[in-house]
């Protein structure tokens, strides 16, 4: 194995530690702190000349701080003559700002972030479950977008008490993801929630396509933000006779009123991964369980360093 160096910012320290343990490689010695005026201070405290460097840093909230930490760390490592720098971004912030809506005067911020990282000197990106896969094309360097679904599916398969399960897509846009999960769950049935607003200023209506009566519903998505839509979807499923509702998602964004929404009796359990650290408030509601992607990301790092196939991990 080439001379791999692992470094981490302050966004996901526990995930970075788990990845380093699985690779049997200690995290690199770096100072990532703040000056008295709040500016980011980075210093690499060991030799990285010619090394294959991986920086582990989600750009989750506080998004701008974590993004700038990553940018400054890349610059510090580039100036220290690192041989190759891979940005390992388990959760890629700003991914939902991937296009202009019709003629709206808005930026495509995902492209701005990609340009920023490319200009500062990254050689490759490793990320997980991009909200929009076309973001890979925003970069001028290779991007490996791995999937958290195998870890989620493995957990679902371990649920021995599931009764007549059905996979549910929370919207039309998530049908491809839900279909893939359903296929891997022994070709189980699938339902779709079609959200419609009949007319302006009228509450959104949830139409459920599929029979969920007396079944355990498994809602799958790439991320959960405020949880408002998820809560309404769970309520609609329960009204249609669903027995239990389990929500599975890779990224636990959990902003705004997420704790209040996910405490709803309509949702029996929420299962997420550790691409974003769980706050104490979210831990306190008692129904959120966290799975780790450390083994998968560690294997991806090993394969990248050894110039092996990443897609073979998911065949």
From Swiss-Prot:
Its main location: cytoplasm. ATP binds at residues 37-39, 96-97. Gene3D superfamilies: 3.40.50.2020. It is found in: Cytoplasm. InterPro entries: PRib_PP_synth_CS (IPR000842), Pribosyltran_N (IPR029099), PRibTrfase_dom (IPR000836), PRTase-like (IPR029057), Rib-P_diPkinase (IPR005946), Rib-P_diPkinase_bac (IPR037515). Keywords: ATP-binding, Cytoplasm, Kinase, Magnesium, Metal-binding, Nucleotide biosynthesis, Nucleotide-binding, Transferase. One of its GO terms (biological process) is 5-phosphoribose 1-diphosphate biosynthetic process. Its cofactor is Mg(2+). GO terms for cellular component: cytoplasm; ribose phosphate diphosphokinase complex. Its EC number is 2.7.6.1. The active site is at 195. It is an enzyme of class 2 (transferase). Pfam families: Pribosyl_synth, Pribosyltran_N. Pathway: Metabolic intermediate biosynthesis; 5-phospho-alpha-D-ribose 1-diphosphate biosynthesis; 5-phospho-alpha-D-ribose 1-diphosphate from D-ribose 5-phosphate (route I): step 1/1. Binds 2 Mg(2+) ions per subunit. It catalyses: D-ribose 5-phosphate + ATP = 5-phospho-alpha-D-ribose 1-diphosphate + AMP + H(+). D-ribose 5-phosphate binds at residues 197, 221, 225-229. Mg(2+) 2 binds at residue 171. PROSITE patterns: PRPP_SYNTHASE (PS00114). The keyword Ligase does not apply. PANTHER family: RIBOSE-PHOSPHATE DIPHOSPHOKINASE FAMILY MEMBER, RIBOSE-PHOSPHATE PYROPHOSPHOKINASE 1, CHLOROPLASTIC. HAMAP family: RibP_PPkinase_B (MF_00583_B). This is Ribose-phosphate pyrophosphokinase. It comes from Haemophilus influenzae (strain ATCC 51907 / DSM 11121 / KW20 / Rd).
């Amino acid at each position: 194995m080439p001379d791999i160096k692992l470094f981490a910012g302050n966004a996901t320290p526990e995930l970075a530690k788990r990845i380093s343990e699985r690779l049997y490689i200690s995290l690199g010695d770096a100072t990532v702190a703040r000056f008295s005026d709040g500016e980011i201070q980075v210093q690499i405290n060991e030799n990285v000349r010619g090394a294959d460097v991986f920086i582990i840093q989600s750009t989750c909230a506080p998004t701008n701080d974590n993004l700038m930490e990553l940018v400054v760390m890349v610059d510090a490592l580039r100036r220290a003559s690192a041989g190759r720098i891979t940005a390992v971004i388990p959760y890629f912030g700003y991914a939902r700002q991937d296009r202009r809506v019709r003629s709206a005067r808005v930026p495509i911020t995902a492209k701005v972030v990609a340009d920023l990282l490319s200009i500062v000197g990254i050689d490759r990106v490793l990320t997980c479950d991009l909200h929009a896969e076309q973001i890979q094309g925003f970069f001028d360097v290779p991007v490996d977008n791995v999937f958290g679904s195998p870890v989620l599916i493995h957990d679902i398969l371990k649920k021995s008490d599931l009764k007549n399960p059905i996979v549910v897509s929370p919207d039309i846009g998530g049908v491809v993801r839900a279909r893939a999960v359903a296929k891997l769950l022994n070709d189980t049935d699938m339902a779709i929630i079609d959200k419609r607003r009949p007319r302006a200023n009228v509450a959104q209506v949830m139409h459920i396509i599929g029979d969920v009566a007396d079944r355990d519903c498994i809602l799958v998505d790439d991320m959960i933000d405020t949880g408002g839509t998820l809560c309404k979807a769970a309520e609609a499923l329960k009204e249609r006779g669903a027995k239990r509702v389990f929500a599975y998602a890779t990224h636990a964004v959990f902003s705004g009123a997420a704790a209040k929404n996910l405490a709803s009796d309509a949702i029996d359990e929420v299962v997420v991964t550790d691409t974003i650290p769980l706050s104490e408030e979210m831990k306190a509601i008692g129904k959120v369980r966290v799975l780790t992607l450390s083994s998968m990301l560690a294997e991806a790092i090993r394969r990248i360093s050894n110039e092996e196939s990443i897609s073979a991990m998911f065949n």
